[in-house]
Every structure is written in C-alpha cells, then in structure tokens.
Amino acid sequence: MNAPFHQLADAILAGTPATPEDALAVLRADDAELMSVVAAAGRLRRAHFGNTVKVNYLVNLKSGLCPENCNYCSQALGSDAPILKYSWLSKDETLKQTGAGLRGGASRVCLVSSGRGPSTRDIDKVTEMVVALKEEYPGVEVCACLGLLKDGQAQRLKDAGVDAYNHNINTAESNHDNIVQTHTYADRVDTVEKAKGGGLSPCSGLIAGLGETDEQLVEALFALRELGSDSIPVNFLMPFDGTPFENTWELSPTRCVKILAMARFVCPDKEIRIAGGREMHLRSLQSIALQVANSVFLGDYLTSEGQDAKADLEMIRDNGFVVLGSEEDLAQQAREPIDPAIRQRGAGTDVVPNA
C-alpha cells in the first residue's frame, strides 16, 4: 500500500496528526482516487471502532418558531418552510418517541429543542424527562441539544443523567457571519466549553454546502479537533424551500464521501456521524460512506423525513457492520428473505417496460 493516502493513514496510525495540507489533499482528490481515499480512511475507522456502527435517534422536543436567523435552518426566524411547529412534548410523549428509536436499534437518543437557549424552566422540563428516560431505559445514552447554555445549566443536565451535549459550530469562524447574525461563533464555542466544564461529552459538528471554500471546511474540522469534540456530526445542507439557502446544491455524492473521509483523517479516533442530508446528497454512496464514518441517525430528522429505518439497518448489515450494543438481535431481525419479483411488464405484456 504505497498510495499517498495509505501513507497518510500509516503516519496517523503511528501517531502523527494530519495537517491542514493533508486534509486539503483528501478533499481535492480526483474522483478516480475515491476508493483509495475510502480504503485508507477505513483503516483508521476500523482501528478505532472495528466493524460497529453507533445508531442515534432524534426526538424534536419543540419544533419551529426559533428567534435565531440561521440561514440554513427550516425552524429559524424568517423561515417559510412548511414544517411542523409545536411547543414542548410532554414527558410521556417523549418516552414514547424515545422508545420507538431504541427498539429500532439506537443506543443514544438526542433530545433537541428549537430556540436560542434554555430557560431555567426549560432545564426543569428536560431534566425531568431525562430522569424518567433513565428509569425506563437504564442503558440509554442521552444527548441534549437545547441551544446556547448559561452558567450552571450543563451541570444540572449532567446531574439528571445527560451524557452528552450537542452544539454544532456548523461552519468555519471565517464563514460564520455569512450564515447567521443573531449570535456569534464565539457564542457557539462558549457553549461547547460550558458543556465540557459541566462534565458532558462534547458533540459538535458542521454543515457542508453552505457556500464555504475548501479551506473553510478544513478550518472548521481543525477547530473541532481543537475543541475536543468527542462526536462530530457531519451534516449536508438540506435546502428547504422558504429559507435563504433554498435551491442551493453545491454537493455531489463523491464530494460528501471525501468530506467524511477528511473528517476521519483529521479526527481518527472520534465518532464521525453521517448526519442530516445523507439521503439526498450521498444517495447511492451511503454504504460507501459507512466505510469511513462509524455513526448514523436512524429514521427521521428534526423537520424532514429520513430513509426508512429498516433500510438503514439493512445497509449496516449488508456492508459487514453491526449495530453497536445490539449485535446479535438486530443482525437476526435484518435477515429477512427477499423473494424474487416475477416480471409482469415489458416484453410479452401490454404494460410499459421498466426503462
């Protein structure tokens, strides 16, 4: 294995971190080199995570009507996207929604609410939900995503049983003001630091396709490495109608795979999660992306529908991976026979052919 990307993997496995120049080389690799990039990044993935895939499940506790003006977001101030809008779910409804995801194979549930950040009453609501969740499902990991944190709130969440806190930096600091003006990049970093200071595992990632340059994608990833993010969700812009980014299509499936591979090279021992937008941007390369990423969201997202959960589990199994924490049970569930479909169209019939 003398290809440059395998040499880079060798160096990283030996303890030499990737440089920004290395990251740019991965991102700018020719499409003809894609499988070499994937194979090299896959060595890092398997060295740290074996053949497991961590499955996460989102529960949108409060949807829409956010006062922040993030240009990419269907829930943001000024968005006309025709999404579901509702106030806080009840504790019982939260338990019901969480149970569905856990039965589907998720080991981590992500409790998300729209808004700038939680009030004291909001923290009260969420901590009550988390205590009930932990009692009902003792082994579940809980990640909260409630916006910008105030002093002491991370500790309250930790004390209630929250394991991690998600707050994405979304893009490079040099691109931040182009996508949101109601809070600063420093505000986002401060919340990640507050989460860490409160004993929560930091979960912070990015969104690709926001008009950023290659250099800004690299800048964002190295910022996440510097922040010490344990879990890095890599989202791909979903250009909702009614938002400033509607009709924005800057990504190809091969570029998305390279972005994920770049994340693996830069942060080899961190959870790299294929997050929002994977279905519309990776398309038929979703399974290839699993060779470098080790985590996915199951089912639907906050305001958009995702791939069928059964298809997600089949994709994991078909690629030789197992769901973290549910290796045996889910492997058997996914092994349902598929009978051949008898042709009833095209030649020899009056039915339009499949062409």
Curated annotation (Swiss-Prot):
InterPro entries: Aldolase_TIM, BATS_dom, Biotin_synth/BioAB, Biotin_synthase, Elp3/MiaA/NifB-like_rSAM, rSAM. Keywords: 2Fe-2S, 4Fe-4S, Biotin biosynthesis, Iron, Iron-sulfur, Metal-binding, S-adenosyl-L-methionine, Transferase. Pathway: Cofactor biosynthesis; biotin biosynthesis; biotin from 7,8-diaminononanoate: step 2/2. Coiled coil: none annotated. GO terms for biological process: biotin biosynthetic process. It catalyses: (4R,5S)-dethiobiotin + (sulfur carrier)-SH + 2 reduced [2Fe-2S]-[ferredoxin] + 2 S-adenosyl-L-methionine = (sulfur carrier)-H + biotin + 2 5'-deoxyadenosine + 2 L-methionine + 2 oxidized [2Fe-2S]-[ferredoxin]. This is Biotin synthase. The gene is bioB.
